[in-house]
Amino acid sequence: MEKLLKSELKVRAIRLGIRNGYHGRVISKMRKKDFIDFINESDCIDLTCDDDIPVNQLKKELQETKKKVNEIQQNAINREREIRREALNREQNLIRVHEDAINNLLLCFSALNLEESQPVQTEPPIDDNNVPENILCPVCLIVKVNTVFNCTHVSCSSCAKRLNVCPICRNPIRKKELRFFRLN
């Protein structure tokens, strides 16, 4: 066995994970003779220098390992971002689909409400020869028309207040004009 300095022996012992010697005493605090006796009696420390790896090679391996770790971390970060982006897109698509479904349901409900609010007509149809003041509201079929929408369809003022879409062409109502027709 070749003779090694105490500092080299301590470095090797620490590298191998041996921190404490006899009776749990820290090896760096041990006397030289006690430390050498401990090393000689210990079977777990190989004191030969043949197995030593050059420091440059260790540094290169460490750098390669760091690069691999950084690469793996970056891949994980990128994958997490991609997953979050996909989840956000799915969520936005679901929201869009639900909003469209809600809008369709609201349109259906408004159409049903209009149909339910219209009483069944028991009178004969109105003659086309009548003057405008005799034209009844197409929604309630009770009151004469006096309001014109932007699409040029007409209704009575009470029905016009409740409407957001034209009952005839289903276009949104942007403008409501109250008109009074002349009596002949």
Curated annotation (Swiss-Prot):
It comes from the Viruses. Keywords: Coiled coil, Metal-binding, Zinc, Zinc-finger. SUPFAM superfamilies: RING/U-box. Residues 54-106 form a coiled coil. The keyword Zinc applies. One of its GO terms (molecular function) is zinc ion binding. A zinc finger (RING-type) spans 137-170. This is Putative RING finger protein 175R. CDD domains: RING-HC_MIBs-like (cd16520).
